[in-house]
């Protein structure tokens, strides 16, 4: 199967990075190299480090980059939670920009063997790194009913989490749940007809929750962002593209925490002025979203949100 991937918010992300031609940059989510290629166009005398843990993506991106004229890059085959450690191994102490393009890519969704999509009948896998142990099949068949409820509520914001979890437990007691379509069928049985008639696919929230759990996406994001901000050089930029509210909330709150006076509540009660000056500045006071044209051409860009942080001292 041939997979197509359209890079989301490409020019907005590159503009946000404010690429210096001799700088050091990191693409934490190489994918199909869309953002990386664009960064390299602006980086004739610098270096780009590209993180990717998905072997299928690495094979494709290596081929794409090898066909380009650029050689000032290195692909790091690791999860971006290991950002600081991998750069330390390369004696990189500070960088001028870091980019995250979060979530599952179009080729991953369209791969009928990976289990990311509820639109294809495939094994319940959902691993970004196919060498890790935990799969969606393990979660669905071994987690307690209470754990599944919490998972669907916290990571999927699923209003019918309780009844879906209960139906899953009943179903797996009769037969192990091993495919995406089997799980979709169980979810549909759990929901009222008025929900099934809505445009949004009834399994969307549950699949999101399972994917986040399998790949520990929210923990990994929080930990990697913490490392990223400490690695930024003065005037370095951190650009993050997210695709659902849980990710965007983490990014937004983390950026705010870096720029807000830690004694804000105390200072509010005092007549004196606060002398707090943050090391960071939020460039995007208003989140950047895809244009109407991009949304028309690539429907997966509709949920994309881009935020930018700059280190100022």
Swiss-Prot record:
One of its GO terms (biological process) is rRNA base methylation. S-adenosyl-L-methionine binds at residues 33-35, 52, 80, 101, 108. Keywords: Cytoplasm, Methyltransferase, rRNA processing, S-adenosyl-L-methionine, Transferase. Gene3D superfamilies: Putative methyltransferase TM0872, insert domain, Vaccinia Virus protein VP39. Its EC number is 2.1.1.199. The keyword Coiled coil does not apply. One of its GO terms (molecular function) is rRNA (cytosine-N4-)-methyltransferase activity. One of its GO terms (cellular component) is cytoplasm. Specifically methylates the N4 position of cytidine in position 1402 (C1402) of 16S rRNA. Belongs to the methyltransferase superfamily. RsmH family. This is Ribosomal RNA small subunit methyltransferase H. It comes from Spiroplasma kunkelii. The gene is rsmH.
């Amino acid at each position: 199967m041939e997979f197509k991937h359209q890079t989301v918010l490409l020019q907005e992300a590159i503009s946000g990075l404010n690429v210096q031609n001799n700088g050091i940059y990191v693409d934490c989510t190489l994918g199909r190299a869309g953002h990386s290629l664009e960064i390299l166009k602006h980086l004739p005398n610098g270096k780009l480090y590209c993180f990717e843990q998905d072997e299928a993506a690495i094979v494709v991106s290596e081929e794409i980059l090898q066909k380009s004229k650029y050689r000032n890059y290195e692909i790091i085959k690791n999860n971006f939670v290991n950002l600081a450690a991998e750069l330390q191994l390369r004696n990189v102490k500070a960088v001028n920009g870091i980019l995250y393009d979060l979530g599952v890519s179009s080729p991953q969704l369209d791969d009928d063997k990976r289990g990311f999509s509820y639109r294809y009948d495939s094994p319940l896998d959902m691993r970004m790194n196919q060498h890790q142990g935990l799969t969606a099949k393990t979660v669905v068949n071994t987690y307690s009913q209470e754990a599944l409820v919490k998972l669907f509520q916290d990571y999927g914001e699923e209003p019918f989490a309780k009844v879906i979890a209960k139906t899953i437990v009943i179903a797996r007691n009769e037969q192990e749940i091993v495919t995406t379509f089997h799980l979709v069928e169980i979810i549909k049985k759990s929901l009222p007809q008025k929900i099934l008639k809505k445009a949004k696919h009834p399994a969307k929230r549950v699949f999101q929750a399972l994917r986040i759990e399998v790949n520990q996406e929210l923990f990994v994001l929080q930990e990697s962002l913490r490392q990223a901000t400490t690695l930024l050089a003065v005037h370095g930029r951190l650009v993050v593209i997210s695709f659902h509210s849980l990710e965007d909330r983490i990014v937004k709150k983390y950026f705010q925490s870096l720029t807000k006076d830690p004694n804000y509540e105390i200072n509010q009660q005092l007549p004196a002025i606060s002398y707090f000056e943050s090391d960071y500045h939020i460039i995007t006071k208003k989140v950047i979203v895809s244009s109407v044209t991009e949304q028309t051409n690539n429907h997966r860009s509709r949920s994309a949100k881009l935020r930018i942080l700059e280190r100022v001292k």
